[in-house]
Structure formats: C-alpha cells, structure tokens
C-alpha cells in the first residue's frame, strides 16, 4: 500500500506540473444557438496545451515533429540544456548518462530521452552531435534544436518557467529539472536532474508505470 501511495503521489505531482492548468471543456453554444460543443479528451487537451507539435532538428540533422514523432504513444524523459553551459548542465548530462546506463535496453525501446537546447542560435545539429559524442551518449537519447520561437514555446508549454519575469528570462534557471511521462496514460512527473541516478530511475519507473526498469537496474 505504501508503494501505491507513492506512485499515486508522483502522478498527482505530474498532473499538477503539466496538466493542472488545463481548461475544462467549455460550452461552445450560446443561448438560442444550435451549435454543439466540441468535446475533447483529456489527452487531447494536454497535447494541445502542453505538447506543441513544433518542428525540431536532431543532432543528426533530421527534422521531427515534437508531438507526432517524439512524444505521442511514448514513455519519455526530457530536459533543457545548452552546450556551452558552465553551470549545472555538464553535471546533469553526466548524471543522465548514468541514468541511461541504469535503464539499459529500455532506452530506445520502451523509453526515449530528449535534451532540448535553450540556445538554438548557437547549438546547431553539428554542435549537438559533438556534445553527445563527448558524453558518450547511447542510442535512444536525442538532442534537439529548432527555431528560437518554437523552443521558447516548448519551454513555457512544458512548465519550465519561473513566476518572476526577471528570473524566467535567465536561461540557466530552466536547466536543473527533468520532466518524464507516459503520454498515452497521461502520467507526468519530474525531479531534479542532479538527483542520484538510481533515485531518478526508481522515481521515473513508478511515475510512468515502468517499475521493472528500476528493478532490472538493481534498484
């Protein structure tokens, strides 16, 4: 029962982080009108509000749609970063390499990892490819860049924000957290990117409905 409560609390946290601001389905018709309201599922609402289908480019130069190609029907883990970061980016990336190793062959099969640059003007696909190679990133982990406006839309839609406008404008404020989720089941949660790798794997597994990932990694 204790583990069930923990799982439920993680998913409730994810719902608050990602979907808590969703608007409820409103009435589309006015008095005297025969126009019927359009009822959308909660999954459609989350995708529409928090998972914009912008075009991004991978470290290999491949064009992809964020929702259609990277998120839909998948279990994912994602974070924001930038290559020339002297703060916590290097430590976070190195920690996620450990996470990837603990998850083993789940990555690229059941789980997909994404790191999105906050400085797309600097981080070209070639820069991202070199960065991934420097950290010996394995298959199933994709680095992404794109149009600055699309990156900013993603950042805000995914909830990597600060209520203080001055702090929100500082890119380094948005590189310390991970967001992970099971898109078809609408389970979302998150944790600090510098948390112990085994903790991330265990929390991730419970949150997205993949507890075997942590057990198989020896957690």
Regions found by a protein language model. Name each.
Residues 2-17:
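N-terminal secretory signal peptides and thylakoid transit peptides that target proteins
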Residues 92-115:
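Conserved helix-turn-beta segment immediately C-terminal to the redox Cys motif
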Residues 66-90, 96:
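Short active-site neighborhood of thiol/selenol oxidoreductases, capturing the structured segment around
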Residues 110-123, 140-149:
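Thiol-based oxidoreductase modules, predominantly thioredoxin-like and allied folds used
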Residues 167-219:
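Thiol-/selenol-based redox modules, centered on thioredoxin-like
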Residues 28-32:
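Boundary at the C-terminal end of the N-terminal hydrophobic targeting segment
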Residues 130-175:
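Short, internal strand/loop/helix patches
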Residues 34-68, 91-95:
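N-terminal "domain-start" segment that seeds a small globular fold
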